[in-house]
Amino acid sequence: MQWLKEVWIIPNQIWISASIYCFKSMNSDQKPKINKSFATLSSRQPALTLSDSVQHALAITKRGVDELLIESEFAQKLARSELSGIPLRIKLGLDPTAPDLHLGHTVVLNKMRQLQDLGHTVIFLIGDFTSMIGDPSGRNITRPALTKEQIEDNARTYFAQASLVLDAERTEIRYNSEWCDPLGARGMIELSSKYTVARILEREDFTKRFKAGTPISVHELLYPLMQGYDSVALRADLELGGTDQKFNLLVGRELQKDWGQEPQCILTMPLLEGLDGIEKMSKSKGNYISITEPANGMFAKVMSISDVMMWRYYELLSARSLAELAQFKIEVAAGRNPRDIKVALAQEIVARFHNQQAGFDALADFDNRARGGIPDDIPEMQLSGAPLGIGQLLKQANLCASTSEALRMVEQNGVRIDGAAISDKALKVEAGTFVLQVGKRKFARITLS
């Protein structure tokens, strides 16, 4: 393959100088060495002194991160950007594997917004092509690939929801099918030659599956390469991802060197713990807060986290400055009720995804429920079968997932009818209209016949 044929697979951008033309006659053994020499040019440049504004930008970038690799390189990127006036290109790729985002997803989006507010170009990359492969990160089994129709359906809501965090007008939206589809078989083989199977198997999840004899499909081995190639196509200066994405992000650095680009730095964000404070936030674990959740429910769920976990949520989700957070901690240590600080966090999160008034209203609703009051907007339903056992009643009212769970709630004094606590698991509820309550947040107005 001639040298110039490597250039066309980078979409919409062709970087050809006079020096590149002279490489056309070189054999393939010579080219990688020449390529990598391009990528090291920046390392030969004298280090720039970091201005106060660059150091401030670096501090904002590092807030709450798990790793910033390589920090000294990124500091120099920031300094060169300030000197040249050319913003850095910041990349975040998301495969639209599910149609809705939760607060755990917004951890990395918040970091993108911080970098966006520093004046850099943020690229919201929708992995419509890689979704058809299925990211194996953190998996002990092959992730099912999505159909094109599923991907399109999920992608429709992705950016709309992400825009609740990002400034949509200043965000570049790209789809990796732009450059992955044109690759074809020849381009895919060429890309695959850039990395060895041994190196890909260094990934912890692949290593575990290989040792356990769990099948690893060939297409899964391609995923890190495809994600890395996205960085080549976009000429990314920094790529963001979760801690489970570190291997894939590092592949991007190596591929950029092979294509003669300055390698991107990588920034990994920690995975946000869910409401239980133990497992990572996940829909499958039921410990999540959806960003499309009603304001009152969102507020109440934030208030349910522990006082210790509150600081973690502040660090990863709040737009408040580090100085403000430090002051909050001083006040709590001096005796201020942590509930006050948690209320401020809950209102901030509700205001971001709804509006400020919704935050005030959610607080009023939460306080009313805490005093034993009944919300105004509770669901109403009609049921039959009176007299009906309390366990069946709670299940049919969708206030408990099962009769066994319902009876446990009765044992724990967590069930009320018209405000009166129920302690009899054998209770048969007669016909009538009444308010049924489970815990502090679940209500239903029942007409039983």
PLM-predicted stretches and their roles:
Residues 255-449:
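Conserved nucleotide- and phosphate/pyrophosphate-binding catalytic cores
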Residues 65, 145-268, 275:
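Divalent-metal (Mg2+/Mn2+/Ca2+)-assisted nucleotide/phosphate chemistry catalytic cores
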Residues 74-136, 240-246, 252:
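N-terminal catalytic cores of NTP/NDP-binding nucleotidyl/phosphoryl-transfer enzymes
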Residues 41-88:
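Positively charged, low-complexity intrinsically disordered leader regions
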Residues 131-146, 161:
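Active-site-proximal loop->helix
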